């Protein structure tokens, strides 16, 4: 049974939409409809407010930590159509970059595997996905996939950095031949897989269909050394699917229904070992699921989140924006 280890009083003045631990598990970033992003030191069960970041002009939907090899960097996205990248310098958090290239609410941000460099994917209600790549000297290159999801994009998630056709490291001194991929979920009820071509452009590689309503979240499972790719998806239709691909070409994906919930499912998140999936929904619970030896997914724990639906107002905001 899972127990609550710590409770953090964020002092946000409105609904909290996301909370993310950093790479080392010592800092917690939160964001809220009060337009703020907060960072706490949560070591040893404590909670010390490190930063209260103000820069957005609307509800902040999501935050994402970059890998620490690039420093202490946090991205946030908002209903105000902006993505802000924050960086800690000499103990002080400041805005280092602002991306205002979308025409509607930006709903999701996700950093690419650190092997690729500092790259951020951003999904928006305008249907586009933008990719921000740090090129040095404070400069960011922007590429945009227009009409990625015709009615709006709700979620983005990168595939792990794996060299195609190989389960071992590249020879010493040889640069790995990574193929960059990520998944997106949208209001067209679809999950789409994207791949970077040799010319640097992004191409739709696959379209996964199983949901009957808006896809709310997608999560590409971490690589554990097996020649299998796995993606979890959840939807307004209350269903969670586990998609697997054992095909070397990456084209043959098979969905398995994990569970049909009685309410919308907002978020899915994998454990670092990819054997446990956390599911958060409108039923005010977080459930943990594990695949049994016979291939069936079993609920191993559920935690009641308390009174109120944690993500209810996200729907209202995104629907109004559209």
UniProtKB/Swiss-Prot annotation:
Keywords: Acetylation, Cytoplasmic vesicle, Endoplasmic reticulum, ER-Golgi transport, Lysosome, Membrane, mRNA transport, Nuclear pore complex, Nucleus, Phosphoprotein, Protein transport, Repeat, Translocation, Transport, WD repeat. GO terms for biological process: cellular response to nutrient levels; COPII-coated vesicle cargo loading; endoplasmic reticulum to Golgi vesicle-mediated transport; mRNA transport; nucleocytoplasmic transport; positive regulation of TORC1 signaling; protein exit from endoplasmic reticulum; protein localization to plasma membrane. One of its GO terms (cellular component) is kinetochore. Gene3D superfamilies: YVTN repeat-like/Quinoprotein amine dehydrogenase. The GATOR2 complex is negatively regulated by the upstream amino acid sensors CASTOR1 and SESN2, which sequester the GATOR2 complex in absence of amino acids. In the presence of abundant amino acids, GATOR2 is released from CASTOR1 and SESN2 and activated. The modification N-acetylvaline is found at residue 2. WD repeats lie at residues 11-50, 55-96, 101-144, 148-204, 210-253, 260-299. GO terms for molecular function: identical protein binding; structural molecule activity. PROSITE patterns: WD_REPEATS_2 (PS50082), WD_REPEATS_REGION (PS50294). It is found in: Cytoplasmic vesicle, COPII-coated vesicle membrane; Endoplasmic reticulum membrane; Nucleus, Nuclear pore complex; Lysosome membrane. The keyword Transport applies. Pfam families: WD40. Belongs to the WD repeat SEC13 family. Functions as a component of the nuclear pore complex (NPC) and the COPII coat. At the endoplasmic reticulum, SEC13 is involved in the biogenesis of COPII-coated vesicles. Required for the exit of adipsin (CFD/ADN), an adipocyte-secreted protein from the endoplasmic reticulum. This is Protein SEC13 homolog. It comes from Mus musculus (Mouse). The lineage of its organism: Eukaryota, Metazoa, Chordata, Craniata, Vertebrata.
């Amino acid at each position: 049974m899972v127990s609550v280890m710590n409770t953090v009083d964020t002092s946000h003045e409105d609904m909290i939409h996301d909370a993310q631990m950093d790479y080392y598990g010592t800092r917690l970033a939160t964001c809220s409809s009060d337009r703020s992003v907060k960072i706490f030191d949560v070591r040893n069960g404590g909670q010390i407010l490190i930063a209260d970041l103000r820069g957005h002009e609307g509800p902040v939907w999501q935050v994402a930590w970059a890998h620490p090899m690039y420093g202490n960097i946090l991205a946030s996205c908002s209903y105000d159509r902006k993505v802000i990248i924050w960086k800690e310098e000499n103990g002080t958090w400041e805005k280092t970059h602002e991306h205002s290239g979308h025409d509607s609410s930006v709903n999701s941000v996700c950093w690419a595997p650190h092997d690729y460099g500092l790259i951020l994917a951003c999904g928006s209600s305008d249907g586009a996905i933008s990719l921000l790549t740090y090129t040095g000297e404070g400069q960011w290159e922007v590429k945009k996939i227009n009409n990625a999801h015709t009615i709006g994009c709700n979620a983005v998630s990168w595939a792990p950095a794996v060299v195609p056709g190989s389960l071992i490291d590249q020879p010493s001194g040889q640069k790995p031949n990574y193929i960059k991929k990520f998944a997106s979920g949208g209001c067209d009820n679809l999950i789409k897989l994207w791949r970077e071509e040799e010319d640097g452009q992004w191409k739709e590689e696959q379209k996964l269909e199983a949901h009957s309503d808006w896809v709310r979240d997608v999560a590409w499972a971490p690589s554990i050394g097996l020649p299998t790719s796995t993606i979890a998806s959840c939807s307004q239709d209350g269903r969670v699917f586990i998609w697997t691909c054992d095909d070397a070409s990456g084209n043959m994906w098979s969905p398995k229904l994990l569970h049909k919930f009685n309410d919308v499912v907002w978020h899915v998140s994998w454990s670092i070992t990819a054997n446990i999936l956390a599911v958060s929904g409108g039923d005010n619970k977080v459930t943990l699921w594990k695949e049994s030896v016979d291939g069936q997914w079993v609920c191993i724990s559920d935690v009641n989140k308390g009174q109120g639906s944690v993500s209810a107002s996200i729907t209202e905001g995104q629907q109004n924006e559209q």
